[in-house]
């Protein structure tokens, strides 16, 4: 966590108890948006002791799945427009999905349109394979990502 808070007063919503699955939740031919959301909703924010779900950084509506093209799109909304943690949040989302999904899915992670001052730059970095690999090989960044994904504080 950072010493000086970037967003000292985030809006926090109550954590949902559980998600209701559709009837086809056990299908063998792919994943659905609710399943993907369930994977990422409990990731802890890098700055606050709240989940991405509680801060409304991610929502059920922010996940799109195209099984025909084996593509998943997650859009996330930083709590402030100048959020310096946007890249870390995106790395957390990507690392968690890499752990949970089969390799054949193409995952795009983007900040919601108009939600970040450096939207184009952040989106480019989060979807550049070489940059993502290099970032996750950095021990300090990897430790922060792992703390957010595997946090016991939640």
Swiss-Prot record:
It holds the Pfam family FeS_assembly_P. InterPro entries: FSCA_dom_sf, MIP18, MIP18-like. Coiled coil: none annotated. GO terms for biological process: protein maturation. Belongs to the MIP18 family. May play a role in chromosome segregation through establishment of sister chromatid cohesion. Unable to complement ae7 mutants, and thus probably not involved in the cytosolic iron-sulfur assembly (CIA) pathway. This is Protein AE7-like 1. It comes from Arabidopsis thaliana (Mouse-ear cress). The gene is AEL1.
């Amino acid at each position: 966590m950072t010493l000086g808070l970037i967003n000292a007063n985030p809006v926090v919503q109550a954590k949902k108890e559980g998600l209701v699955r559709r009837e086809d939740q056990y299908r063998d031919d792919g994943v659905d948006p609710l399943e993907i959301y369930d994977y990422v909703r409990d990731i802890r924010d890098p700055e606050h002791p709240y989940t991405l779900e509680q801060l409304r950084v991610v929502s059920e509506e922010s996940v799109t799945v195209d099984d025909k093209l084996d593509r998943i799109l997650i859009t996330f909304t930083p709590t402030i427009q100048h959020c310096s943690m946007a890249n870390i949040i995106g790395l957390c989302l990507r690392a968690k999905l890499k752990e949970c999904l089969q390799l054949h899915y193409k995952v795009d992670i983007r900040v919601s349109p108009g939600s970040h001052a450096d939207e184009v730059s952040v989106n480019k970095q989060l979807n550049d394979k070489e940059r993502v690999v290099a970032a996750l090989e950095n021990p300090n960044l990897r430790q922060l990502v792992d703390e957010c994904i595997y946090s016991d504080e939640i």
